């Protein structure tokens, strides 16, 4: 008996039933918002821009389907100096306002780098607030010896800039003494107690790093990202420019990478360290500087790195984001290369 044909008919009927029993819903594509469109970085070479060409470019971008631009001023084109506009000057702010107005007309968003080139810095950053590095120098003394020596930075380039942060004395018996107060006018006058003493001087120096690829008007020192005062000074210049020229903040501000070379200190680090970690780093400078890895040296260096990470997150990333929010803007960060937990740093801004 052949049952295959009957079986086929049964499957066919069952299939028709399933198709007709399942309701068919019409699917419509959701409304496309500005956020769904791609955006582009917009290099302003030398900020040599004018209203006519800004409008032409923005209309071209809009026709291509772009939903926003990110303005990044950078160094200019050789031979075009006469058309360059200084960053944050009244004329530059007029160009930004024109861009905002045209973007609004075209349904696009205006974003900008909160600086020129990278990393953040410029003429508003004094040497006091520039990126900082530690220098350690050592001296020796025997018990009963009176030391009357100059405590100066050996590097001649730093001699007029660097300053003494701490001078600590460590004996072979385990004694630790802060003798910073014994230094007057860069000269130490101190008589060593019994024992053999190792003196470690900690100086704060500057890296002298300049903003890379800076646009006209943006040249200057890279700021101390660990210093709340330095970061406040930096964004205060932006706040003043936007306020005085009556230009609203853009949709977002961007940080075009960290890339701060050699900056491993900040003037308040020792006081911040004891407040956060519960002990004084200066009392453990021999262990901190010891190249041999032990449980103690590893823990101290870990605490040091954790302190730097917290200062970067709180004094730079969070302060920057709070500043942007006060002006109705949001932040976007390129945190890679930062001395901190990258996930924490990205989580501190609005757009990772």
Residue spans of the language-model regions?
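Short glycine-biased active-site loop of nucleotidyltransferases that positions the nucleotide triphosphate
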Residues: 31, 341-346
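Bacterial N-terminal signal peptides
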Residues: 10-23
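Aromatic-lined carbohydrate-recognition surfaces of secreted/lumenal glycan-active proteins
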Residues: 110-121, 251-257, 304-341
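N-terminal secretory signal peptides that target proteins for export/translocation
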Residues: 1-7
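Glycine-enriched alpha-helix->loop->beta-strand junction motifs that scaffold or abut catalytic
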Residues: 65, 348-352
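Glycine-rich, proline-tolerant flexible connector loops at the mouths of alpha/beta enzymes
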Residues: 72-85
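Mature extracytoplasmic enzyme cores
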Residues: 28-32, 37, 46-49, 53-55, ...
């Amino acid at each position: 008996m052949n049952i295959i044909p009957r079986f086929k008919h049964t499957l066919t009927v069952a299939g028709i039933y399933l198709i007709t029993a399942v309701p068919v819903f019409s699917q419509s594509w959701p409304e496309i918002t500005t956020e769904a469109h791609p955006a582009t970085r917009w290099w302003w070479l030398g900020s040599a821009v004018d209203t006519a060409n800004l409008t032409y470019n923005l209309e071209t971008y809009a026709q291509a389907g772009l939903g926003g631009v990110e303005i990044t001023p950078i160094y200019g084109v050789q031979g075009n100096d006469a058309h360059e506009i200084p960053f944050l000057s009244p004329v530059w702010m007029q160009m930004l306002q024109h861009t905002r107005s045209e973007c609004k007309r075209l349904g696009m968003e205006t974003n900008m780098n909160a600086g020129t080139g990278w990393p953040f810095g410029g003429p508003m950053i004094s040497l006091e607030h520039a990126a900082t590095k530690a220098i350690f120098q050592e001296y020796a003394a025997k018990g009963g010896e009176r030391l009357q020596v100059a405590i100066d930075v050996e590097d001649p380039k730093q001699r007029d800039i660097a300053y003494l942060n701490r001078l600590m004395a460590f004996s072979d018996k385990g004694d630790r003494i802060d003798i910073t107060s014994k230094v007057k006018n860069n000269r130490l006058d101190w008589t060593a107690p019994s024992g053999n003493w190792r003196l470690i001087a900690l100086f704060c120096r500057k890296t002298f790093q300049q903003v890379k690829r800076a646009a006209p008007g943006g040249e200057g020192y890279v700021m101390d990202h660990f210093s709340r005062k330095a970061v406040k000074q930096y964004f205060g210049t932006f706040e003043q420019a936007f306020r005085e020229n009556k230009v609203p903040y853009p949709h977002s501000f961007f940080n075009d990478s960290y890339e701060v070379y050699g900056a491993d200190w900040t003037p308040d680090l020792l006081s911040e360290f004891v407040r956060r970690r519960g002990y004084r780093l200066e009392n453990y400078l021999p262990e901190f500087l010891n190249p041999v890895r032990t449980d103690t040296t590893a823990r101290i260096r870990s605490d040091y790195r954790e302190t730097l990470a917290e200062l970067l997150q709180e004094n730079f990333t969070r302060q920057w984001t709070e500043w942007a929010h006060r002006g109705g803007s949001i932040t976007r960060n390129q945190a890679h290369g930062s001395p901190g937990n990258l996930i924490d740093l990205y989580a501190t801004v609005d757009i990772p």
